[in-house]
Amino acid sequence: MQKTIPMTAYKSTRLSGIIKIPGDKSISHRSLILGGLASGETHIHGILESDDVFNTAAAMQALGACIIKKDDLWIIRGTGNGCLLAAQKPLDFGNAGTGARLVMGMVGPYHMKTTFIGDASLSKRPMARILDPLQLMGVEIEATHGNYLPLTLYGPKMTNPICYRIPVASAQVKSAILLAGLNTAGTTTVIEPILTRDHTEKMLKAFGAKLEIEKNAEGTRFIHLNGHPHLTGQTIHIPGDPSSAAFPIVAALLIEDSDITIENVLINNSRMGLIETLWEMGAQIELLNQRQTGGEDVANLRVKSSVLKGVTVPKERAPSMIDEYPALAVAAAFAEGKTVMLGIEELRVKESDRLSVLAQGLKINHVDCEEGQDFLIVHGKGSAKGLGGGHVTTHLDHRIAMSFLIFGLVSEKPVTIDDKRMIATSFPEFIPFIQQLGGKIS
């Protein structure tokens, strides 16, 4: 068993410089999956080279795609839609929840057996929300531990198209059903009451799928996908991940006299919740050189240290920032006044019970906070005095690890995390990037 690698962050002064954040994790997974399904070659620039993404790439190779890496360019020769091969051994997704769930949707309709396994953290994450619609489509599931990994899917001879209303806002559920619809005759419809990140819809259209979106007066989206489309390989330029950018953004806002620029960051409307919330708190964040890359909105972010005040974050905003709440909680700890985060029960089924672990980490660093089943209230002091000094147990959660290292850059006393290794699942360059800007982590 590998040894844990603790890491400590110390109070830092003035972050400055320009960095380019790694590629967006959501788009990286989807690029590999759709590129592996499409006919011809897909060229991917700027892919996130992290453990999670490598695991999805390995799964696509096991299912018949050919993937070649040439420097920063990834070239995929896809199987063609409907032509995946049966994997010869279980698909091991490590910690990659997105990869596992999306590939379950993709392979579910294939008349073959596919087994999914993962690490200890992923094996605790519920899969029922993906498996329920797949069962309605005719997929049989064999799982020894309830709706958790390891599990095996047995695809039917003929898949049923479904009309499925998503019970909880989830881009992964929506995407898994749409990917299943690619190899299903007829029209598959997903009803989405609350908008979640829409990369799958945009990319399906770009690859050639016949997909239509309707919206009613209440804002509910009806996404219709015609089955068995011909998908054609594309050239994809992946913008920087806003979920990773969250950490240097919060650090620069909180550390006095900081002024940093983060280049080429995705600013898709369905991913802007954190920046909107920080603006409400008083953050100086400018969107510079706004442009479009591959159908996605992109900008450079200039971030200057700011005096923040507490706010209430409505539950409706949660889907657009679900991965950024740990970073927001750090900002809230140093803001003036109370910050209330509502409708965040989804955090309980992330890499850890992220809501509980976040509250515990704040408390051992002397932050006054209240945790509820679906909310977190942080009482900010408006200063770093008396904060920090804690040893945070990260529970194999990369976002908890990065959040409390950022906390330690700001707090009066150093903060130590028990293990830095899982940071590689989403942001391998995190520590050197922060050090490059002037942050003290060792």
UniProtKB/Swiss-Prot annotation:
It comes from Bartonella henselae (strain ATCC 49882 / DSM 28221 / CCUG 30454 / Houston 1) (Rochalimaea henselae). Keywords: Amino-acid biosynthesis, Aromatic amino acid biosynthesis, Cytoplasm, Transferase. PANTHER family: AROM/DEHYDROQUINATE SYNTHASE, PENTAFUNCTIONAL AROM POLYPEPTIDE. Monomer. The keyword Transferase applies. Its main location: cytoplasm. One of its GO terms (molecular function) is 3-phosphoshikimate 1-carboxyvinyltransferase activity. The keyword Isomerase does not apply. It is an enzyme of class 2 (transferase). Its EC number is 2.5.1.19. This is 3-phosphoshikimate 1-carboxyvinyltransferase. Pathway: Metabolic intermediate biosynthesis; chorismate biosynthesis; chorismate from D-erythrose 4-phosphate and phosphoenolpyruvate: step 6/7. InterPro entries: Enolpyruvate_Tfrase_dom, Enolpyruvate_Tfrase_sf, EPSP_synthase, EPSP_synthase_CS, RNA3'P_cycl/enolpyr_Trfase_a/b. It is found in: Cytoplasm. It catalyses: 3-phosphoshikimate + phosphoenolpyruvate = 5-O-(1-carboxyvinyl)-3-phosphoshikimate + phosphate. Phosphoenolpyruvate binds at K25, G97, R125, Q172, R354, R399. Belongs to the EPSP synthase family. One of its GO terms (biological process) is aromatic amino acid family biosynthetic process. It comes from the Bacteria. Pfam families: EPSP_synthase.
